[in-house]
Amino acid sequence: MTPDLTQSAITPARLTHLQRLEAESIHILREVAAECERPVMLYSIGKDSAVMLHLAAKAFYPSKPPFPLLHIDTTWKFRDMYALRDRIGSEMGFDLLVHKNPDAQARGINPFDHGSAVHTDLWKTEGLKQALSKYGFDAAFGGARRDEEKSRAKERVFSFRSSEHRWDPKNQRPELWNLYNTRKHPGESLRVFPISNWTELDIWQYIHLENIPIVPLYFAAERPVVERDGALIMVDDDRFRLRDGEVPQMRSVRFRTLGCYPLTGAVESTAATLPQVIQEMLLATTSERQGRVIDHDQSASMEKKKQEGYF
């Protein structure tokens, strides 16, 4: 006798919004691991990188991911970021590579003497290109999301790079549904963005749901800041150069995005828990990257940086 199947038994479980995003990202991670010879995951220590690491751990569990982490070190990150980087690398079992541009290091490039554009180009863009060439990586996972910024909004999930690591936004490959093209000539590479379709809200909800460790700078606390050019800049160490008349003030602030500390503005906030951060984000009327000084170097500066090889 044929058993009577209930409707619940024959209807597939309905995935939540976050579960669908998670499944898509895991599919992308596995696709690259299967199709590319030497992939790497870029690790900037921010909330998006934290989510990518968590997804990678899930995608290949119980084995460790078949690719290393790569951190491009500018030497100017927040101290809390370095502390988390060193702890996470060892706790999660990832192979962590750290690269510093030797030319920028020898010349003492910094955001105070050389400005944000030169600092970013030499430490980040050139440093990344050096590391990718040095280790021969043919695919690099990045944590960029389409809702962050207009040039990222139009970039493909699988983003083709020339042998000089350059991006041509007018010559992008079509992407149909979940079919991805990883073919490339020797010397060429891909930048792959597994969380491209996630929003800032998705990221925070997933971090809350999965209990993912993040840098404490995302939570409000009393911190020493100066108001400079319309931004609240945190005085994180004794290398910070105060201008005439500037006196650090203790204010309750947090960061929505993280980069080099002299180039990253905080926002005044009392959100000290994940639910409070999510609630504050839902009510925000400003961009997530409003505090990133490098985004305001010139018109369309992010797209120009990406064309030259930036993350």
Swiss-Prot record:
Origin organism of this chain?
Caulobacter vibrioides (strain ATCC 19089 / CIP 103742 / CB 15)
What is the gene called? cysD
Top-level taxon of the source organism: Bacteria
Q: What is the reaction catalyzed?
A: sulfate + ATP + H(+) = adenosine 5'-phosphosulfate + diphosphate
Q: Which GO terms describe its molecular function?
A: ATP binding; sulfate adenylyltransferase (ATP) activity
UniProt-listed HAMAP family: Sulf_adenylyltr_sub2 (MF_00064)
Q: What does this protein do?
A: With CysN forms the ATP sulfurylase (ATPS) that catalyzes the adenylation of sulfate producing adenosine 5'-phosphosulfate (APS) and diphosphate, the first enzymatic step in sulfur assimilation pathway. APS synthesis involves the formation of a high-energy phosphoric-sulfuric acid anhydride bond driven by GTP hydrolysis by CysN coupled to ATP hydrolysis by CysD.
Classification via SUPFAM superfamilies: Adenine nucleotide alpha hydrolases-like
Q: Name one GO biological process term.
A: sulfate assimilation
Q: How does it assemble?
A: Heterodimer composed of CysD, the smaller subunit, and CysN.
UniProt protein name: Sulfate adenylyltransferase subunit 2
Q: Which UniProt keywords apply?
A: ATP-binding, Nucleotide-binding, Nucleotidyltransferase, Transferase
Q: In which pathway does it act?
A: Sulfur metabolism; hydrogen sulfide biosynthesis; sulfite from sulfate: step 1/3
| Cited InterPro entries | PAPS_reduct_dom, Rossmann-like_a/b/a_fold, SO4_adenylTrfase_ssu, Sulfate_adenylyltrnsfr_sub2
Please give the Pfam families that the UniProt record associates with this protein. Answer: PAPS_reduct (PF01507)
Gene3D superfamilies in the record: HUPs
Please give the family membership noted in the entry.
Belongs to the PAPS reductase family. CysD subfamily.
Enzyme Commission number(s) of this protein: 2.7.7.4
